């Protein structure tokens, strides 16, 4: 069975910044075809749940709403996720969209106003740079 890295919040784990989950309706179908490997890069990077929301700034730093630079946590979580992908031989990931760690293609712009911009989250970018195909949850039909 093929392996799929998946954002833990999409599996129903309450690990999002707000302490909630974001269950993906297609999970039961995915389980029929993939061995799901849950990850939460933000938690794996040492951030608590719940936590202040954070966004990637124009200079690449990740800063939370309180003004704290949490870039190191995001990088650590991304590296831990990449290590899991390598160890498991996983070349495919389904991640939570718009997230500063997992977002692919569109993320919040750093102004903490809910404005989206083109870009990738820290973890999504690292996975893609290392040959892992990343899809957002709205692309689940591509699996």
Question: Where do the protein language model's features map onto the residues?
Answer:
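Short, surface-exposed acidic-centric catalytic microdomains
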Residues: 22-63
């Amino acid at each position: 069975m093929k392996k799929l890295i998946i954002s833990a919040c999409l599996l129903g784990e309450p690990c999002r910044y707000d302490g909630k989950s974001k269950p993906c309706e297609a999970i039961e179908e995915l389980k029929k075809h993939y061995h799901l490997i849950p990850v939460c890069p933000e938690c794996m990077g040492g951030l608590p749940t719940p936590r202040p929301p954070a966004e990637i700034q124009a200079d690449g730093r990740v800063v939370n709403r309180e003004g704290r630079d949490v870039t190191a946590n995001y990088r650590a979580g991304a590296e831990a996720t990449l290590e899991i992908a390598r160890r498991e031989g996983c070349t495919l990931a389904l991640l939570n969209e718009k997230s500063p760690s997992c977002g692919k293609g569109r993320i919040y712009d750093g102004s903490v106003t809910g404005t989206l911009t083109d870009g990738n989250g820290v973890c999504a970018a690292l996975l893609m740079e290392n040959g892992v195909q990343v899809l957002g949850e709205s692309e689940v039909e591509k699996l």
